[in-house]
Amino acid sequence: MAVVFEKTKGLTDAKLHYCPGCGHGIVHRLVAEVLEEMGELGNSITCVPVGCAVFANNYFNIDAIQCAHGRAPATATGIKRVRPEQLVFTYQGDGDLASIGTCEIVHAAARGEKITTIFINNGIYGMTGGQMAPTTLPGMKATTAQKGRDPKVNGNPIRVSEMLSTLTGPAYIERVSISTPAQIAQAKKAIRKAFEIQKQGLGFTFVEVVSTCPTNWGVTPVKAMEFVRESMIPYYPLGVYKDITVEEGK
């Protein structure tokens, strides 16, 4: 019988700790599949965040380091400069990257560090119990915004891809999602392109994944996917925000 689908060698046999319906498992698989298909499993290092993905080093079958909160881009910068032949990437959530780690991600991008960041945007703080994140939508409820986010009080959500795309340093920025099979396929293509551009030494690459958090959104996994399509994506439009390989014909 022909094999239609099998587990990638890029993941260990450790049981994932993520909640049912969480998008991290899907993105982990995509990243691992791309690394395996590129032949980079023995040549990759991931910088793991503080947040729901804090144990990602147990799941990716590659070298990994756990970073201080928000400092994964700084850690990745040091690793890449010392080991430029390695494929180095950070894997971060919206609290780790867009709040406490804003300085690190902005300046790594501005410097054009030859690393890749996989950014999971689910609009909430997952690990700590559902507090409002920099990406929480207007009107969206959180434990620290029980009546819904009020832009007059809490400010507006940060569109990280758009913000970083204004900088000269990034080589490639794309926002994708995983709420449909077609979106998952596109997300995998974006991750592969980000890694390929890093291997070419062209600059900083960034893939934002609009994802889910059914537990802290207080909905079922199915409803969470619907919320992504109906509410998250309209505020965080999918697409390529910067690609110097197209702009410069590389």
Question: How would you describe each model-predicted region?
Answer:
Residues 1-126, 189-193:
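Thiamine diphosphate
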Residues 133-200:
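Conserved thiamine diphosphate
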Residues 1-4, 13-14, 199-250:
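Flexible, low-complexity linker and terminal segments
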Residues 102-107, 127-141:
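Active-site-proximal loop->helix
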Residues 50-52, 122-124, 180, 208-216:
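Glycine-rich beta-alpha junction loops
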Residues 14, 40-44, 82-88, 110-116, ...:
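Short coil/turn connectors at secondary-structure junctions
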Residues 62-65, 108, 133-137, 223-226:
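Short, hinge-like loop/turn segments at secondary-structure boundaries
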